[in-house]
Amino acid sequence: METKNIRYIADAWKEYKQHFVKQSSMAAYLLLLNKHILPEFGNCTELPEHEVQSFVLRKIKGGISAKTVKDILIVLKMIVHYGAKNGWINNYSWDIKYPANEQKKELDVMSTDNFKQVLAYLQKNFTFQGLGIIITMNTGMRIGEICGLQWGDIDMDTNCISVQRTVERIYVMEGDKKYTKLVVNTPKTQNSCRQIPMSKDLLALVKPLMKVVNKSYYVLSNSDKPIEPRTYRNYYKDLLAQLGIPDLKFHGLRHSFATKCIEAGCDYKTVSVLLGHANISTTLNLYVHPNADQKKRCIDKMLKSLGK
């Protein structure tokens, strides 16, 4: 076996991998590679489990989330697997442990009163960017998806919105050159490409506009150029401040939509499909947390079915 270090293998892996993934995915891989993997393991020709485990614990202790660390390991494993296929390094099967979370952080959602206040204000003070917030609150779309929404994605025959593109700014590395660029891409997964029915209120708001807009234009800008997510986040943040509403991340609107669906008794599979989750377990883990009363009703319902 002709042993090579991780830096050499990573260079070869990059040339190979870029042909099979989206540019945005490759950009995310390279960011993790250059920021975390190469500084730690670039010169290594062996990666025993204890070294990787120590790396994981140091990163988490340093304030990096377990999710990000897991993403780093996914990239590292891809590189090692590629190197092993080429006979440059042993193929390792690490059993990495992560510190137990002391307390699962609750999702930040908008209160019902604030939710109604935002909708009422935006309906009374119409702008195209404001319409994007209304659509997000009615559909749970991601910020990149709402930035990528075009008028032609709104079907007045089916009364549905078709999610089929996303806008994102990616980090690009080309040799010594490092820069960012805005890209319009397909959504993050196959499940993210989806049809979302419009509510009666949203339909009434959009219907008159559809007679006069250019179907190839982006909804938020009403032009052929999209608004980028960072700019739209700033608009949203300023809107909340203007209305005196506590700061909430834009993604909190998606959480709010999903939470209100679950609280209203919508079935979990339908909510999962509306959100574009890859599988229903993501929806269940994020949004379904039965309280004591719900658990009691469940048991009572089961016993009632048995005639008890």
Where are these predicted regions, by residue range?
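Active-site/catalytic core of tyrosine-dependent DNA strand-transfer enzymes
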Residues: 197-246
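C-terminal catalytic core of tyrosine-transesterase DNA break-rejoin enzymes
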Residues: 67, 85, 134, 138-145, ...
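Conserved tyrosine-mediated DNA breakage-rejoining catalytic core shared by Y-recombinases
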Residues: 149-208
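N-terminal core-binding DNA-recognition domain of tyrosine site-specific recombinases/integrases
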Residues: 2-4, 14-82, 86-88, 104, ...
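Basic, Lys/Arg- and aromatic-enriched nucleic-acid-binding interface segment
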Residues: 66, 70, 85, 89-91, ...
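Conserved hydrophobic/aromatic pocket- or pore-lining residues that grip, position, or stack substrates
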Residues: 37, 52, 76, 97, ...
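Short functional hotspots where side chains directly engage DNA or cofactors
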Residues: 160-163, 219, 260, 272-290, ...
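DNA/chromatin major-groove-contacting recognition/catalytic segments
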Residues: 118-121, 173-177, 285, 289-308
